[in-house]
Amino acid sequence: MYDLIVLGGGPAGYNAAERAAHKGLKTLVLEGRALGGVCLNEGCVPTKTLLYSAKIFDYTKHGDAYGVKCEGSSLDHAFVVGRKNKVVKQLTGGIAMQLKSAGADVISEFGIIKGRDAEGFTVEAAGKEYKGARLLICTGSDALVPPIEGLRESVAGGFAMTNREILDMETVPERLTVIGGGVIGLEMASYFCSAGSQVTVVEMLDHIAGPTDGEISKILLKNYQKKGVNFILGAKVTKVGEGKVVYEKDGKAESVEADKVLVSIGRRAHTQGIGLENVGVLTERGAIVTDEYCRTSVPGIWAAGDVNGKSMLAHTAYREGEVAVANMLGGKERVNYLSIPSVIYTNPEVASVGETSESVKAKGIEAKTASVTLKYSGRYVAENEGGDGIVKLIVDKEHNRLIGVHMIGNYASEIIYGAAMMVEKEMRVDDVKKFVFPHPTVCEVIREAMFMI
C-alpha cells in the first residue's frame, strides 16, 4: 500500500514524487516512457541544446562586426543531434538517481486507474495492481495532429513530423514548412534556418507567438524575416502531401513546396486510456479540471502539469506538483497562473510575465505602459550591433502596480524571473525604483523603465 501513486514521470510527476518521498510518503511513480516527460526528452531540453549550437554558429557568421574572423564555419547537424542525445541521457539519469535517493519507487510501465474502495485507489500497470491512498495524475500532453486532409498519412509516411520526430531527424531538409507560429514552431524554425533550411511558417492568426504581447511579437517577426524565415500569416492549411502544403488565404487556395513539414499547432492533455472514467474525474475539452490548489473533482486525486490544460509549461508543472503534495499533507498552497513567466528561446530571446496590452484591453483594466529600448544598457550596446530589443512594462493605473513585463533581447530568459516576483508580490512602481540593480547589466533597463511610466 502506497501513500501516493504518481501517474507520469515528467516535470510535475518526478518533482512531486521527490518532494513527497522526502516528506515521508511512501511513493510510487509509474512512467511508461522515459523519466523527464516531454520537457526533457522531446521538448525544453532537446530544443535548447539545438538552439545553443545554432546561436554559436550564428555568432560566427556575424563575428566581423566584433573583430572576430570565422571564415568557413559550418554547423554539423548530425553532431548537434548526437550531443543533444548525450545531454538528455545525462539528465534523465540524474532524475532516476534523485528519485532513488529520495526513496521513491519507479516502475517503467503506464498506469491505469481501475477504481476506488475504502482503502484507496487501485492502479494497474503491466497486469499488476497497486494500491494508493492518494493519486497524483501527471500524464502530460501529446502533440495535436488536426484533421487536415493528408496530414495523418503524411506523418505516418515521414513527410510530416511532430516535435518528437523532428528532434531526431538526421539531415537538414532543403525546404521546411512549419504549420503553426507558436513557441515550438518558432524555435524549430529558428534552428533549421540557421542550419541551412529554407523555412516557411504558415500561421492561421495574423501574428506569431500566440498570446505574446503584440509589440514584442512584431519585433520578433522582423528579426525572423531578417534572418531569412518566410511567414504566411492569416492562412488556414487545408491539405498536406505530395511534397507541398496547401493553404487558404484571403479566400484563395495557394501552396508552398516542402521536403519536410513540422506540425506544431499546439498540444492536448493526455487523458485517454488512463481510467479517469473509473473514478469519475471531471474533464473539460479533454483536460482534467483542477482548481488553484491542484485538486480534481474527486477527493484524494490531484492533477498537475500539462494534463490540466492550463499553462503547459514545465516550470508551471514543477510548481503544480509541489502545490499538490503540500496540500495533500494539509497545506493551503495555491498556484498564481498570472505570475508564471514564459520564454521563447529564439535569438533574440523573448520573455513575458503577466498581462499584455491586449489582455488588459480585453479585461477592461485601466493600464499605462512604457516601452524602453535595451540600448539604455551599456552591456546590451556593447554586445549587440544594431540590436532592437526592448522591455515593456504594464502598470495598473488605480494602484500603480506592476502587472506585466515583456522583453525581447539578450538574457531575457534569465531576467524574467525577477519581473515575475515583482508581479507575484504586486509591487508598485515606486517600490521597484528603490531597488539597486547591478551595472552594467541588461536587467537594469527594467528599473530605468519605471521612471518613464
Residues covered by each model-derived region:
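Flexible, glycine-rich terminal cap/loop adjacent to redox cofactors
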Residues: 7-10, 15-33, 38, 45, ...
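Gly/Ala-rich phosphate-binding loop of Rossmann-like dinucleotide-binding domains
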Residues: 17, 21, 189, 193-194
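Beta1/beta-strand and adjacent pyrophosphate-binding region of the FAD-binding site
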Residues: 1-12, 172-182
